[in-house]
Each structure stands twice: as structure tokens, then as C-alpha cells.
Amino acid sequence: MMRIAVGLEYRGVGFCGWQSQPQACGVQDAVEKAVSAIAGEAITVTAAGRTDTGVHAALQIVHFDTTSVRPLTAWVRGVNSHLPAGVAVLWAREVDAEFHARFAAFERGYRYVLLNHPVRPGLNAGLVGWHHRPLDVACMNRAASPLIGRHDFSAFRAAECQARSPVKELRRALIERRGDYLLCDFRADGFLHHMVRNLMGCLVQIGAGGRPPEWLHEVLAGRDRTRAAPTFEAAGLYLTHIRYPARFALPESSERWPFA
């Protein structure tokens, strides 16, 4: 028995999120079907994170166990030949049995790509978020700065979130303008369900002048989801960054997507 780690990228459009579904519409369903075809046996994969419907991954890392001996290229090119458009294997590595795609990760990162332009996206529809009014990036960064550190993020937690604790350590919250796009980066030891999209909803209100920067810290301190802004759309959210202990020697990000 050997354990294989695989790096993936995918568009969330057209899938019911990452997790396997009874109607087989999850990205996981497509990946397991393709890997099983190459392995010649039923394969179950475990992912670093479970993205929601419409959320993308510039890098998702999964592992699986198999008795089938294949060259690593088979787990890349062979699996890709069985995957639908919008999903691709980037690389494959053999890892030891101690590696676990979910539990061995000690940091994850998301990037929200937001088109800030009066006209809605056409070519990038479904791949970026959108806000039509000018956004003040400096105000958004001032608002986000006090969130860095270990806090109770209950105010940004979805009602259906299954995390045991709302306390997370946010290590990065940084917004950068690149032409008409805002690239909004978040890194933490873990994320609550809808946490990034709920933060984005608040930051966009602040950037548009609807709220002062101090409001975001007040929402955080209040720990009340009803005091925060509505959840922002899924379209612009990407899983981008997964860190493991150095001994596993796995890439922690991908530079090949256009918003890297």
C-alpha cells in the first residue's frame, strides 16, 4: 500500500462544491472516478479543504491510498485524461503514511478576486466577484488590520458551520489593487464556513463608504452574525495556499493561474 499526494486546480462553476454528493456533482466525485480508472481499483480521496459551490481552487491538495504501482506521471497525465474540463492534476508525489491532506496542514490561504468596475464581468463571469462602485483599498486594509491574530470569529461564521471552535488565528488579511481588480488575501490556521465571504461582505461595504473602518472590529467583538454584512458571492473565491511541515516537501501554492 502506498500513499499518493496530488495537487489539483479547478473551476467551481458547474460543480456542487468539493464534497462528494449523492448525485455525483462534487469535484471529489470527478476526481475519484478519474483516479480509480488509472488505479484499476476504487479510490477515495481526502482533501485539504472542502470548498463550497461556486468556489474555485488554484491549489487543492488531496491524498489517497492505493495498492497499484504506477509512475507518478500516470497520476498526472493519466488522471487528467479522465477528468472533465475545469479540473486538472498539477503534480503527484509519493508520501509517507503520516501525511494527511487535511490534518497535517497548519495553514491555509484564500484569495478573493473582485472586479471593481461599473460594468459587470463577461469573460470572467463566475470566476470573479464584482462591485460597481469605486472601492477605497486603503480603508479596507485599515479595517482588516485589527483582525490579525487569534480571535473568536463567530460574527463571520455560517449558521451551518460544523467547526468545533470559532476561534481562529488570522495571519494575513491584505487587499491589493491590480488595475480594475482587487486581490484580497486571507491566511489562517483554519477557516470557518463562509468566513472569507462574510469578511468580504463587510470589507466591500467599508470600501464603498457605507461603513467606517472601525465598524469591522466592532462586528468582530460583538460575535453576532446578524450585525455583519450579507455573505458575498462565491464567484471570486479561490483556495490558493496550503502549508505542511517541511519534511513532506510539497508545493504550498501555484503560480500558473492568472491572478497569482
Curated annotation (Swiss-Prot):
Substrate binds at residue 110. InterPro entries: PsdUridine_synth_cat_dom_sf, PsdUridine_synth_TruA, PsdUridine_synth_TruA_a/b_dom, PsdUridine_synth_TruA_C, TruA/RsuA/RluB/E/F_N. The active site is at 52 (nucleophile). It catalyses: uridine(38/39/40) in tRNA = pseudouridine(38/39/40) in tRNA. Homodimer. Belongs to the tRNA pseudouridine synthase TruA family. Formation of pseudouridine at positions 38, 39 and 40 in the anticodon stem and loop of transfer RNAs. This is tRNA pseudouridine synthase A. It comes from Thiobacillus denitrificans (strain ATCC 25259 / T1).
